[in-house]
């Protein structure tokens, strides 16, 4: 009977210690797990809200174009970038090619709770080449060079190539009332690797892949909502994008 009592007590003590160990592990694990679940990192989906405009002067091949983009690390409130850009355009008589000389100002915000920002001044040159693929598909090739003055870095230049595609769904071309699909892929290449103070960047800067559903609202407005995946040399990040396109 004493032997049975000893065994019973031993089992109770062992079980109690084991249960205590599990409880301690749970107490330690739960707070850290909760923090990990709640923490925001650069892989969380961001959101870009954008307005694009283009203006052709009357009876002229000259015009203006520009955009305002409010980019967030999250869905809203954590500023990634505020981009203001505009340029003077010249379009060939057949409207197949548009050349642009422009300027951009970019305010970049730090990720997370920090309110610190940095500024960039940018001059760019662009060639946009348009052509069709069959009756419905419209393609645009965009080649852009950028001269960049980024705060805290040496002068830098960058090359970009983007391929854009629009496909009308309920018509043969995009006009008021038309729903359409919009796609693009754009690659960015750094032309300098040294950016000052012993810091270097890779030639590959980033790639953006985008898909969206668009609707021609009429009165020279189009609305697009979609998703863009951006892969850089260090971060892969998804972005929800909502854009309003205005031509006048």
Describe the role of every protein-language-model region.
Residues 62-66, 84, 97-101, 139-143, ...:
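Transmembrane beta-strands of outer-membrane beta-barrel proteins
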């Amino acid at each position: 009977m004493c032997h049975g009592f000893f065994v019973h007590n031993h089992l109770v003590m062992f079980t109690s210690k084991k249960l205590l160990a599990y409880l301690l592990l749970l107490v330690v694990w739960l707070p850290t797990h909760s923090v990990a679940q709640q923490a925001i990192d650069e892989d969380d989906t961001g959101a870009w809200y954008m307005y694009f405009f283009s203006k052709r002067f009357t009876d002229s091949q000259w015009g203006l174009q520009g955009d305002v983009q409010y980019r967030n690390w999250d869905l809203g409130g954590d500023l990634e970038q505020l981009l203001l850009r505009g340029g003077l355009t010249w379009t060939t008589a057949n409207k197949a090619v548009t050349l642009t000389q422009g300027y951009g100002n970019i305010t970049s915000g730090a990720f997370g709770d920090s309110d610190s920002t940095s500024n960039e001044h940018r001059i760019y040159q662009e060639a946009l080449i348009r052509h069709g693929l069959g009756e419905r598909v419209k393609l645009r090739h965009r080649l852009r060079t950028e001269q960049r003055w980024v705060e805290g870095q040496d002068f830098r230049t960058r090359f970009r190539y983007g391929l854009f595609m629009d496909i009308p769904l309920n018509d043969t071309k995009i006009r008021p009332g038309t729903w359409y699909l919009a796609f693009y892929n754009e690659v960015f290449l750094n032309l300098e690797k040294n950016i000052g103070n012993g810091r270097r960047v890779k030639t590959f800067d980033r790639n953006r892949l985008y898909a969206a559903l668009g609707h021609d609202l009429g009165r020279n407005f189009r609305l697009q909502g979609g998703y863009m995946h951006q892969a850089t040399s260090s971060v892969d990040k998804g972005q929800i994008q909502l854009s309003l396109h205005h031509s006048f």
